From Swiss-Prot:
The gene is RSZP21. Expressed in roots, leaves and immature seeds. Involved in pre-mRNA splicing. Its main location: nucleus. Residues 124-138, 151-162 have a biased composition (Low complexity). It comes from the Eukaryota. It comes from Oryza sativa subsp. japonica. This is Serine/arginine-rich splicing factor RSZ21.
């Protein structure tokens, strides 16, 4: 099986229209057209040679970009990202991922198998592992209340401009130049 990515599609194109264009090259397994966001589709061929023929003839036609998909398997989990070349982190074998590894899963189901031990430098120190509150954060009531903005005036007072300092730039000497003064109302 081979999967083609078809990009730069008109948002109104239907799976039937794509099926008509691609089925002349060989047997199709499925046609999936994206709707959110629109503009691309995946076409699954039974035979990789048929997909390559379609790629050669249809790439650029109607402004489409057609290329072999990097994920050429529709089965969930296995062979994703070229799984035959990827190695398992648990056992080092190719063809599966660590979450599917028989060493990790074991005979009793998920999590019952033996895992490789981590290096000493990456393990947590004992006092953190034994602490029941490790990873929890305690919040004080002060943390939960919204912070007060320091720029808002204190009740009972208002700020007004003083006529002094209106001539030059208020920032000429790095301060406000006396432009804003507080006065009681």
């Amino acid at each position: 099986m081979a999967r083609l990515y078809v990009g730069n599609l008109d948002p109104r194109v239907t799976s039937g229209e794509l099926e008509d264009e691609f089925r002349v090259f060989g047997v199709l397994r499925s046609v999936w057209v994206a709707r959110k966001p629109p503009g691309f589709a995946f076409i699954d061929f039974d035979d990789k040679r048929d997909a390559e023929d379609a790629l050669r003839d249809l790439d650029g036609k109607n402004g489409w970009r057609v290329e072999l998909s990097r994920n050429s398997s529709s089965r969930g989990g296995r062979d994703r990202h070229g799984g035959s070349e990827m190695k398992c982190y648990e056992c080092g074998e190719t063809g599966h991922f660590a979450r599917e590894c028989r060493l990790r899963i074991g005979p009793g189901g998920l999590g019952s198998g033996k895992r490789r031990s981590r290096s000493r430098s990456r393990s947590r120190s004992p006092q953190y592992r034994k602490s029941p509150t490790y990873g929890r954060r305690s919040y004080s009531p002060r943390d939960r209340s919204p912070r007060r903005r320091s720029v808002s005036p204190v009740r009972g007072r208002s700020y007004s401009r003083s006529p002094r300092g209106r001539g030059g730039s208020p920032y000429a000497d790095g301060r406000d130049g006396g432009r804003y003064r507080r006065s009681r109302s």
